[in-house]
C-alpha cells in the first residue's frame, strides 16, 4: 500500500446545495479534480472515504461536490478536513523531477560538505520555487536560509536514498 498524500483542504461551504470550497495543494490547482477517490481526514484524526461527484474552478479557488453531500448543513461538517489520496495515484515524474514532499526533510550540504540544515518546506514565488532550509543540531548553525530551487544553478545533487541534497551555496548567506 502506498503512502497518503495531502492534495488539499476543505475551507468553507459554497451555496446551499452542499458544495464546498477547497484550497488545492496541487499545481495547477484544478489537478486535484483528476482524483475521484479521496480520503478525508478530520481535525481530530478521524478518516473517511469520499467520492468526488463534481468540481470546478471558482474565482481564485476550487469548489467541489461530494457524493452524498447535498445540503449546506451537512457540507459544514466537512470544513477543516484534509483531502488525501494514495501516492500511487500521482503521475510518474521524469528523471530529475521531484514532488515537493520528496524534498521536504532532506539534509542540505554545501558543495564543500558543510551541513546547513534540513528542507523545512518550499515556497512558490512565481519566478521559481524556493527551499526553506532550517538549521538543526547537526548543522553549522540554526539559521533559516532561502535557497532558489534551480537545478544546475544552485541545486547540484539530490539523493533521495541517502536523504540529502547538495547545493552551491555560501553558508554565510
From Swiss-Prot:
GO molecular function list = ribosome binding
Question: What InterPro entries does the database record attribute to this sequence?
Answer: PRC-brl_dom, PRC_barrel-like_sf, RimM, RimM_N, RimM_N_sf, Transl_B-barrel_sf
Q: Which domain of life is it from?
A: Bacteria
Cellular location(s): Cytoplasm
Entry's Pfam families? PRC, RimM
Q: Which UniProt keywords apply?
A: Chaperone, Cytoplasm, Ribosome biogenesis, rRNA processing
Q: A biological process (GO) annotation for this entry?
A: ribosomal small subunit biogenesis
Which intervals hold domain PRC barrel?
A: 95-173
* Coiled-coil blocks: none
GO cellular component labels: cytoplasm; ribosome
Membrane-spanning intervals of the chain: none
Tell me its family.
Belongs to the RimM family.
Q: What does this protein do?
A: An accessory protein needed during the final step in the assembly of 30S ribosomal subunit, possibly for assembly of the head region. Essential for efficient processing of 16S rRNA. May be needed both before and after RbfA during the maturation of 16S rRNA. It has affinity for free ribosomal 30S subunits but not for 70S ribosomes.
Domain notes per entry: The PRC barrel domain binds ribosomal protein uS19.
Q: Which NCBIfam families match?
A: 16S_RimM
Oligomer status and interactors: Binds ribosomal protein uS19.
HAMAP family per record: Ribosome_mat_RimM
Official protein name in the record: Ribosome maturation factor RimM
Q: Which organism is it from?
A: Hahella chejuensis (strain KCTC 2396)
